[in-house]
Amino acid sequence: MENEENRQKLDLELTGHSNSRLSVAQLGLLERISVSFDRITVVGGFIPERESWVKRHVESNNRIDLRDTGYDRFKCHALDNKVYVEYNRKQAQSMGRSEIRVEFNPNELCEEENQFVQFMFLDNMRDKHFSRIDLAFDVPVNLEDYYVMSDKSVKQTVFYGRNNKPETKYFGVRDSERYIRIYNKKKQLKEVKEEESEHDHLWRIEFELKRSMTNKWDKCFDDLHILQPDYLSIESFEEQAKIYYLMNEISAWSKIERSTKYRYKKKIKEISEVNLSDDLREVLSGQHKRLSEELHSYITISHHDKLYDFDFEL
């Protein structure tokens, strides 16, 4: 009994949580994890017959803030800066890239605003595809003491708060095809938007996907593990110390051989009763149809015979 109490006490000192743990699913939080697209960038070209129509309305619509314009170009913000559109046919031809780029956050658009973006811009484009998709999970769990690890070799950057606990973690590099952010969403809402979350804890796990990774959005975290390792399940104190050092000193991983890295990563997964990534995959599976249909709606070939429930002001 005394050994068990000592074990739990040491576990609290090392990990910040008790050794008696339950998975997110067991805690009844699974249905409270939300998943959505937090940013979308659609690129393509104008349907030739629609170019002049769009340009004329961009220059006259009071919901659009025109920043630059010319014979075959324009830049604008729409819907109170919720949407950014850039079009430059000459530059696209000279640089071999798409003519028009439409950027927006679906979470910030109401249904009527979403329809406005569709009708004004997306429905008038051809050869549409995604150059960027941000997939975001909002998790009502305190991720300060979770250990995040990838099976792949990726750069990791961690920023700590005043309590010396992690507040933001980055995996990868910004211009890569996949860039991962994990941060304290509750704190961000309070400091940036002056909003209070109803949850005791709220963290965001966000995948910024570019180029070819936009086609693999539903597989973007198959190599990622968000874990609660149980150090004390390892009998050898020397082995405990090595794993603790690797998990708390990022640079330590660069000092060991590849085969040793594989062995210790495997060991960390084995001693973790909870892998939050499993819960994220379950949530994504349940929402996959809805998310797929949403993406399809942005790039589907459309016709201008649709009726929309908004006033198209000129």
Please annotate each region the language model reported.
Residues 1-256, 271-314:
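Structured, helix-rich domain cores that form ligand/interaction pockets
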